[in-house]
C-alpha cells in the first residue's frame, strides 16, 4: 500500500500558512517591534522539508497579497525562506539554540540580499514597508541608492529572522516523537534529541 | 471465510519499547456489532487503526502476523479500495470536517467526489443519508460553523455516504453531551439494522451492553477476553482488569450470589425489567 | 423538510445573473492582468489612472462596486501615498525643489513617486477585483479543470479556512492569557515573553490535528488514484467568452506594441 505520509504534508502546509498570519497578528496585538510573520514557513519548512517550505511560502504570499499587495513582488523571498528552512534543518541547524540563531542569521542575510535586489530593481531601492522609510532616510543622507537598499532590507531581515527562528525552534522542541517519525526531516530531530 | 481476520498480530510503534498489540488472533463475522473495551492506553485505538489499514502505512513501526479484510491481506489493499470498504469515525468532531467545503451537503459529498462517483449518484446518496440521519435542517449550513455534536453527525453522514460494509468507530461520543451521545447511538443503531459490520470502541459501558453482539476486552495490547456480550459481562472479575461492568450486570450477579438468580443473566435495563416483572408475577401466582 | 431547490442547485452549473461574474475565473484573471500589464509599457501615470478607473468600472459592471470600493480605497490610500512620499522626499535627483536636512524633494522624485503610486493603484485594483469577483472554490475548480492536482486545491482552500479558525482561536487565547494575569502589556520584553505561550498551543494543537485530519480524509478516499468528480460545477466556457478573452488579449497586445513604439 502507498505510504500515506504525503497526506500529512498536505495538511501541514495550510497550517504553516495560517500560523504565518496568526504570528504576524499576535506580534501586532502585542505591539512587538518585529514582524514574526514567517514562523509557519520556518517551522513547517524545517520539519517537513524544503518542498513543503516553498509551498507554505508561496501560499502565504498569495493570501497575504490580498491585504498587502506589495508582498506579491517578493514572492521569491517567501519561497526562499521555506527552501532555506528545509535545507538548513536537514543539515541539523534547528537542533540547538546557537545553531538556530545561526540559521536565523543566515536566512536573514540571504533573504535580505534577495529582498534588496527586488527592492533595487523593482522599487528604486525603496522597500515596501518601514524598510522603505529607512532606505529613504539613508538616501536622503547621501548614501547611494544601492547601499541604502541593502542596508535597510538586510538589517530589518536579520533583526526579524533570528527571533523567528528561535520561536520555530521552541515549537519544534515540543513536537512529539510520534509526529517526527512521519516527517521528512523528522530523523534529524529524533537523533538530535536522543542525546 | 471470516470477514476480518487477525492471525498472530503483533505491532510495535516506531521508537516504542513494548508492543502495543501482542499476538492477537481473532475473526470477525459479517453483520455483527463488536464492542471493544478496556482500560486507557490498552491499545483499542491501535487495534482500530490496524484494521483501518493505517498500520504500518501511516504510523510506520513493526507489524508481524497477518490481517485479512474480506480475505485479502491488509498490505495488499489499495487505499482507495479500502476507503470504500471500511469507514472510520473517531472522537474529535473538529478534525473530521474537511474545512474546504462551504455547505454540509458538499461536505458529505466529498468522499464520493474523491472516489469519482458521478454527480447524480452523489446527489442521491447524499440525500438519502441526510434523510436517514435526520439532518435535513443542516444541509445548507457551513460545516465549519457547526457545534461539536452537529459536526459529529456530519462526520457520520460523510462516512455512511461512502456505503462501506465495515465501520470502525472509536469513542464517537467522548466529546459530546448526553443529547449528542443519544443522537449518535441512534445512528449506530440504524447502521446495525442495515446489517453493517461494526467495531465500536466506547467507554459508556451501558451502551456497549445494549448494542454489542460480542465484546472484546483489550488490556496492555492483549486480547484478554472475548465472547457474547452477556457472557463477558457476567464475569465480574473483569472489574479487576480495569474494565467497567454495567450496573445491571452487577445487579444480576448480586441476585445470583443471593441465591435468587434471574433466569437469564440481565445486562441491560430492559432485560432486568423483564426479569423482575416475571419474578414479580411468579410471586403473585404463588 | 428537505430543501429540494437547494439540492437541485447542484444539478446545474453555478451561475449568477451577472455576465462578468459568470466568466471563468481564469479568464477573469487573464483580463485583469492583461489590463495591468499595459502600465508597464506606457510609463505614463495618466495611463495608470485610466486603467484604475477601468477596474472600478469592471467592479460596477460586476455589481460588486460596494464590496470593491471600500477595501480598494483602504489599500490604495495607504499604499499610493506611501509610494509617492518616500520617493518624493528621498529620491536623489538633479532638479531640486526643496531641501532641508535629509528631506530632498526633486522633480525626478515627484515624477517617480507619481508613476509608482499609480502603478500600485493598478496592482491593488487587480487584487481587490479578484477577491470580490472570484470565489476561491470556483478558482480551484477551474484550476483542476486545466490539470492542477486536487491536492493543490485542498491546500489553497484549507489555508483560507485555517486562517479564519486560527485567528479566532488566537483571540480566545489572548483573552484567557490576560484574564489569567499573564502580562500582554508592559515593556517590550514582557510582551515578547507573552508571544510564545499564545502561539505555541495553537500551533502544536494544529499539528496534532493535522495527523487526525490525515486519517479522517484518508477514510474519505482522499488519496484515491481515481480522477475525482465535482458535485458543484461551473459551466463550460462558452465560445463567445473564449472569443471575448482572445479579443481583449489581442487588443491589449496591440496597445502595448503601440506603447513601445510611441
Ligand atoms: N503514535 C503512537 N506512537 C507511539 N506510541 C503510541 C502511539 N499511539 C499510541 N501509542 C501507545 O500505544 C499504547 C496503546 O494506545 P491506544 O491509543 O491504542 O490505547 P487506547 O486503548 O485507545 O486508549 P484510550 O482509551 O486512552 O483511547 C499506549 O501505550 C500508547 O501510549
Ligand atoms: Mg483510544
Task: List PLM regions with ranges.
Chain A
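Hydrophobic transmembrane alpha-helices
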Residues: 1-47, 51-62
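Residue-level signal for functionally critical sites in structured catalytic/ligand-binding pockets
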Residues: 7-12, 35-38, 60-64, 78-81, ...
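Interfacial aromatic-anchored transmembrane helix boundaries in multi-pass membrane proteins
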Residues: 21-36, 58-96, 129
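Alpha-helical transmembrane segments in multi-pass membrane proteins
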Residues: 12, 16, 20, 41, ...
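Membrane-embedded alpha-helical hairpins and interfacial helices in multi-pass inner-membrane proteins
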Residues: 29-31, 71-73, 94-195
